[in-house]
Amino acid sequence: MFRIKARVPRKVIAMGLPTAWGAMAITYKLACPLAQQDSLGARVVTSAVFFAVGTGLILHVRQALVRELRQVREVAGAAQSALLRPLPPRIDGLNVAAAQHSADRGARVGGDLYEVVATEHGVRAVMGDVRGHGIAAIGTVAAVLGSFREAVHDEPDLGRVLRRLDRALDRQLRERTCDDPVSEEFVTVLLLEIGRDGEITALNCGHPWPYLLTGTTVRPLARTDPLPPLGPFPLPTDLTPLPCGTLLPGDSLVLYTDGVEDARDARGRFFALQAALAGAVRNEPITPQAIVRTLFAALVRHTRGKQADDIALLVLRNDRTRLHCDAPGARGTARATTHNPQPTNHL
């Protein structure tokens, strides 16, 4: 003998309590003798009954809305985390730390994007900033990041990676609805490639240059003018990556979006990022995780927690060591290896 268990729909259960409250109020009004009286006491009791029923209905609706909002945030948080996924603490000998904050309250991901991928061509990183901020920019972030994650493995040349990103952005803008102001859409992008020997090459489309931390010295990685941002203008024919020196063992790169340096205090003063970095490493070099924590704490103090734009930070430190040949005049070159500290990527 089979038993079929019928499940009552959740919506029916949710409506049961307010329906019962409403029925109780109507029954009281129509059937209770006290409700038919016109005395002051009867009026007070009747008002109290209807007030209690109304309060119960309001609380029930509020609880249902809060529960639904919590579920929506959980789904949105999972989707956003899949889009801008947490980076592993170590990538091919590099110690990595990253964090971002959306200007839209309740959104985990905004218009800033970053990714670091180990490939056969070297460690490749991207840092970008979509025009606008918050949830409205997520579609463009998804298009650029998706193209980057595929292109870095397929393309041996960094210039061809950038062209793939440009084509992905162009497709995304063309697929937007006619009501969106796609003519004003643009994305700043910084592409970096760090070879096994620490050699850095870069392509920069309108993005702030990162800072290079060597011991307690802080300086920009490059000072050349970047290319225009992706979107408004076509890329030039020649996309030769710019050599930017070497990331030696112990050196760090600090990538950031313009929301960091554009953050203002109550008096309208901009955040002095280079000075903050110099203060962070004044005594001794610190880990990427500590750099990110220190900078975010300084930003919160500077703006009093009122950021007007999305902000993102990405720190890469070369934890590889070099092995030199012991015998003088021995043939061969130094080979990069890695050691095994156990850093954390949690802030």
Whereabouts are the PLM-identified features?
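Preference for bulky hydrophobic residues occupying beta-strand positions
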Residues: 98, 125-128, 192
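Conserved subregion of the PPM/PP2C metallophosphatase catalytic domain
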Residues: 1-77, 81, 88, 113-122, ...
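Acidic, Ser/Thr-rich low-complexity segments on the non-lumenal side of membrane proteins
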Residues: 81-119
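Primarily the active-site beta-strand->alpha-helix module of PP2C/PPM metal-dependent phosphatases
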Residues: 107, 113-176
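Short alpha-helical scaffold segments that flank and stabilize functional sites
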Residues: 79, 83, 147-150
